Amino acid sequence: MTTLTPILTRNWDQADSFTRAAYEREGGYRALRRALGMPPDDIIQAVKDSGLRGRGGAGFPTGMKWGFIPQGDGKPHYLVVNADESEPGTCKDIPLMMANPHVLIEGIVISSFAIRANHAFIYVRGEVLHVIRRLQQAVAEAYEAGYLGRDILGSGFDLELVVHTGAGAYICGEETALLDSLEGYRGQPRLKPPFPAVAGLYGGPTVINNVESIASVPSIIDNGADWFAAMGTEKSQGYGIFSLSGHVTRPGQYEAPLGITLRELLDMAGGIRAGHRLKFWTPGGSSTPIFTDEHLDVPLDFESVGAAGSMLGTRALQIFDETTCVVRAVLRWSEFYAHESCGKCTPCREGTYWYKQMLKRLEAGKGEEKDLETLLDLSDNILGRSFCALGDGATSPVVSSIKLFRDEYLRHFEQGGCPFDPAASTLWGGATK
């Protein structure tokens, strides 16, 4: 039985967990003092040795990404933290920044020192004003204590940190669209190469990492790369925050080693809501192919989830019981992607629009089996042809739902409407059963 590993979340139950005093009480900023006494390249090597992979979805090795930054080039280097958490079901970074913003700030200072960056940015969703205020308060506290600014802790290292508010576009979670937005332009993905490590923010070498990725760095420096690498699986090392939402008794954030299964997490969360059973779930948010109860024992690591036909993504585990219409769920996700498409490329702009139109008609029972083949053909014209991964992600729930629940689509056509009571899947609907 895998057990939880509260590291990033260990002080969330403290009333003042978001303050500098509470963070220092738990050993906060100890790793920073150690890091400032190390050669920057040794920090990068430690992160490589730990096996830390990006926690924002792609799972790219963090230390390797840092190593791409050219040194001795005479250009200013930048660190950008992607806190534009916007995908349906993904809800780990916002509570982390609310409950423990100083672990992120400490990670930013260490990471910036490692890549020789003197300017860092936290790009936050514009809608989460409470998080923005919490971050700004924490940054001010860090400046007051000498953890930010000039000559940090007498090391001679300078770092300016800016909390930047986005305008609410999901596309700005794509790293190059985020850079465009940060520079004051409309957020749209850039052509790669050149990659941000060579020509990123303002044309300078830039590292872009997820909140949880950067927040994991202090524990690696404090406890050692071997400590981190000992957790998780052989190729997916360390711990992560798993977000359980939907039809589960105790939804929330569960921090555990990678490789834990949904069955184990559901046991910790009290199981599916009383009187119901699991129907389908997402392992990594709405942009990942859905799983069913047959996948309860798939280890939640990058390789195992990929081998089973989906992606670990952001570990946003959306749980749906048998009262949920899979067609309606896929329609809701498709409406989101159609609304959030930036419009730059034709496959995504037109494809997500037609997803929405077709699924709305099919959910109402106005379709036939050949329409499913049209949806799959449409998916083939989006997947791999869109300018960025947003288009690819939009195809995942559509294709996987047709593969796993074709009969449910056909029931809509046979009955001339949705066979599910929409109220039954709600919290109050479930309570009346």
Model-derived features: where do they sit?
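Hydrophobic alpha-helical positions that pack around
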Residues: 132-258, 270
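Short amphipathic, charge-patterned alpha-helical segments
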Residues: 107-111, 257-275
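Histidine-anchored nucleotide/phosphate-binding helix
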Residues: 100-114
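Gly-rich Lys/Arg/Thr-decorated short loops/hinges at beta-loop-alpha junctions or inter-strand turns
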Residues: 23-29, 81-93, 196-201, 243-248
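Ferredoxin-type iron-sulfur electron-transfer modules in oxidoreductases and energy-metabolism complexes
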Residues: 30-46, 75-77, 83, 90-97, ...
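Cofactor-/ligand-binding subdomain signature composed of acidic, glycine-rich
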Residues: 1-44
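Short acidic, glycine/serine/threonine-rich loops at helix termini
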Residues: 58-59, 64-66, 90-93, 132-137, ...
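Conserved phosphate/anionic-ligand binding catalytic regions in large, soluble enzymes, centered on
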Residues: 49-69, 166-180, 184-186, 338-350, ...
